[in-house]
Regions:
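Conserved, structured core segments of small domains
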Residues: 1-139
Length: 139
């Protein structure tokens, strides 16, 4: 079963910055472990306002009890509240339609673009523009 979990963290004002960083490092390490076990499927960071620390997570667990154990194992549980939404299959889910996607990868689209160079444009301008775009493409 899959669960969407909104995790909202409120760090105590009295907590030293170095202690917060240590907890965040432990959280990152535990997240990697859960991902390797196939229990943590995805994490997203929604747009945040100043002072917010919120994460959306997609978890796989056999039941609510196992999910609670997984969440309890992730620091900083004492600073965090979790809002859990159990997810069920949707009749239009691509997987149910036989369309499988690699985790983290959506459908791919082939897009053809035609660039028209205005008549009379010097060849050097075209070459420079193509070179600039080639440098930017990996970004």
């Amino acid at each position: 079963m899959e669960f969407l979990v909104t995790m909202t963290t409120r760090v105590p004002d009295s907590m030293p910055a170095d202690a917060v960083e240590r907890v965040r490092a432990r959280e990152a390490a535990r997240s990697r472990e859960l991902a390797a076990q196939g229990k943590l499927l995805r994490l997203w960071r929604p747009p945040l306002r100043p002072g917010e620390w919120r994460t959306l997570g997609l978890f796989a667990a056999d039941d609510n009890g196992e999910l609670e154990q997984l969440l309890a194992s992730m620091p900083p549980r004492s600073w965090r509240t979790d809002d859990v939404t159990p997810l069920g299959a949707h009749p239009n889910d691509p997987v149910g339609q036989g369309i499988t996607i690699a985790p983290g990868k959506g459908p791919e689209f082939l897009i053809a673009t035609t660039i028209m160079v205005p008549p009379g444009t010097p060849a050097q301008v075209v070459d420079d523009t193509v070179a600039r775009e080639a440098r930017r493409a990996p970004q």
